[in-house]
A protein has these predicted regions:
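Acidic, serine/threonine/proline-rich low-complexity intrinsically disordered regions
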Residues: 281, 287-293, 309-327, 344-352
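Acidic, polar low-complexity intrinsically disordered regions
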Residues: 29-177
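Short linear regulatory motifs embedded in intrinsically disordered, acidic Ser/Thr-rich regions
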Residues: 294-305, 328-338, 351-353
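Structured partner-binding subdomains within large eukaryotic complex subunits
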Residues: 165-305
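Polar/charged alpha-helical tracts
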Residues: 31, 123, 248-256, 313-317
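Phosphorylation-prone, low-complexity intrinsically disordered regions
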Residues: 1-18, 353
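Alpha-helical interaction elements in eukaryotic regulators
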Residues: 22-25, 140, 144, 148, ...
Length: 353
């Protein structure tokens, strides 16, 4: 899948897309197509849930123009960043007496300028779309994805500008520490109020860990955390929208309520008492918070096998393949993730999503 179409909503006979006009209920769709169970053979990298029509207003010609203009800027900035690195006249440290700026300061000025120019191009062609990024481990992804998708269609996220969500399926060579990326799409990610409203719901009603807001233009350009330009891969970091204390308070309130055993479908913040918001999905949140281990349900179980007589055999083969992969990877000295984006959080000894 190329960078140009990673964010394009599939059309035609791609069966891993749900819309309000689909002939199956959302719950059935989510039960049938679980990201931990759908193996990406190169033809089904994503599972999509769409709230309504695509609200993005650019044309294919606009997208081509965006790519051409922004690519020139990116090449220019990348070359300048490399020149700064190799320029001996620019000091490593700034000098207050002479007023000389450090390499880091000069580099960051160029990167800020590039971000501003990218935004100008985005507004010029109305290429303003983008997404909130989240990550979850394979063992937790099904519940977390189901919670998000349900919220988008029938829960508090339905009252936001978010119009679509997608989750990465499981690569054939997934290692034991694999993380699935989840994207929640907005027509205008430069609308700070809109993305912040959704952020509060994702924290307070779901307890999710968030990795920032990324413009589709940046995906189109291939800008990630390892890009040689050093341009930040997200246009909004969590701290740009809310302070750490507020973020932690919302998550603490969610998990405190969860610990107390309360369970109800949450209202949106606009319709509910801000001091009395309930979690959207207790089971999904439990998957995102460490707790006493219990015997888990077979992750290969499915609720609907009617359309595939060989499904049971495929599951057994897939389970054996996953077990073999896990054993092989544990014996390896290297552990390389294969997620679509480079913004995923670094994994520590304690596994979390």
């Amino acid at each position: 899948m190329t960078k140009a179409n990673e964010d394009a909503i599939p059309e035609g006979d791609y069966k891993y897309v749900w819309t309000p006009t689909s002939n199956v209920p959302l719950d059935d769709f989510l039960s049938k197509y679980k990201p931990s169970m759908v193996e990406n053979d190169g033809t089904k990298p994503w599972i999509w849930v769409r709230k309504g029509g695509d609200t993005r207003s650019f044309t294919p010609a606009d997208e081509i123009a965006v790519l051409e203009e922004s690519s020139k800027i990116l090449t220019e900035i990348t070359d300048q960043i490399e020149n700064i690195k190799n320029d001996p006249s620019i000091p490593t440290r700034s000098n207050k007496k002479t007023g000389a700026k450090s390499k880091k300061e000069v580099r960051e000025e160029l990167q800020r300028d590039a971000r501003e120019r990218f935004e100008e191009i985005a507004r010029k062609y109305k290429y303003l779309c983008g997404k909130w990024l989240m990550f979850a481990s394979t063992e937790k992804i099904d519940m977390i994805w189901s919670s998000l998708a349900t919220s988008l269609i029938n829960g508090p996220l339905a009252d936001t500008d978010a119009f679509c969500a997608k989750v990465a399926t499981t690569p054939r060579d997934a290692n034991p520490n694999h993380l699935h990326v989840i994207c929640l799409y907005f027509p205008d990610v430069y609308n700070k109020d809109a993305v912040t409203k959704a952020m509060k719901i994702l924290l307070r009603n779901h307890g999710f860990n968030l990795s920032g807001v990324k413009s589709d233009m940046y995906t189109l350009l291939g800008i990630d955390s390892k890009h040689p330009s050093g341009i930040p891969s997200t246009i909004w970091k969590n701290k740009d929208l809310m302070d750490d204390k507020e973020i932690q308070a919302l998550k603490d309130a969610f998990f405190a309520e969860l610990k107390g055993g309360k369970s109800s479908i949450a209202q949106s913040p606009d319709k509910a008492d801000p001091n009395d918001k309930k979690p959207m999905d207790v089971s999904a949140a439990s998957a995102d918070k460490p707790k006493t281990k219990r015997k888990q349900k077979d992750i290969f179980a499915s609720d609907d096998d009617d359309d595939n007589d060989g499904e049971q055999k495929r599951r057994a083969e897939l389970m054996q393949k996953k077990k073999a992969t896990a054993v092989s990877k544990r014996r390896s000295d290297k552990d390389k993730d294969s997620d679509e984006d480079q913004e995923k959080p670094k994994r520590k000894a304690a596994r979390r999503s």
